Amino acid sequence: MAERYFIISGLLFVILFIAIFVYHFIKVNSFYNRVKDFCFANNFKFKKNPNKNVKFQITGFTKKYHWIFQNFIVKPNYISGDEIESYFQFSVPGVKINNMFIIGKAEMANSPGIEELDEKVVSMFLKNVLGEKVAEKLNDIIVIEFGRTDAFKFQYLTLSHKKANPLLIIDEELENLMANGFDWVADNDFSLVILPDRLIIKTNATNEISDIKTVIELGTKIIMRI
């Protein structure tokens, strides 16, 4: 009787294991199939696991720039016990622009004055985004405010080191996309910056095609304005 019980229990365990494996396999492949369909519909190129740190990669061409969308995966640290991190990164190598930087969203707080924002924003931008080598090359930084109306949820800050004629590439269409298209992103998981030779958008990864589309759409719209 006991032997029969163990056999049945073992079979149930095997069946459960197979069911979980099949469910995961179907779920993962269903996601990749939807990504492939999205790429095919937009003439993008899809590649799964281009290297050990990238789950999948999408490439496309807009105007004169080739862009790359990647789902990076950071392997866990077995010593510290840190969990696996997964994030999206949209990048455009070779963007030739030296006077434009964009920093992510800051929540509206009773329309704060420029003086209140300047020190905090510039300090965070230099420390977390540009790095010392790039920051050294900036002679002068000013903050130009956008979205000071109730039409948008967030305020975007554009930083430039050319006071006379800063290049403005954020308009209402872009700002609306940035404000309403990234509700799924936590504030500290979203960064967008144009460096002297590269545009980068980085945010947390999801399994929603609409989120992938939003990141690519934002990046390509910015490229079209450069």
PLM segments and residue spans:
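Feature marks short, highly hydrophobic, charge-poor N-terminal signal-anchor/signal peptide-like helices
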Residues: 1-11
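Generic alpha-helix initiation/capping and coil-helix boundary signal
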Residues: 2-3, 32, 212
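Short strand-coil-strand connectors
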Residues: 40, 61-65, 95
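Transmembrane-cytosolic junction motif
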Residues: 18-42
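Acidic, Ser/Thr-rich low-complexity segments on the non-lumenal side of membrane proteins
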Residues: 47-79
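Core hydrophobic alpha-helical transmembrane segments of single-pass membrane proteins
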Residues: 12-18
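Charged, low-complexity intrinsically disordered regions
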Residues: 36, 45-55, 80-85, 89-226
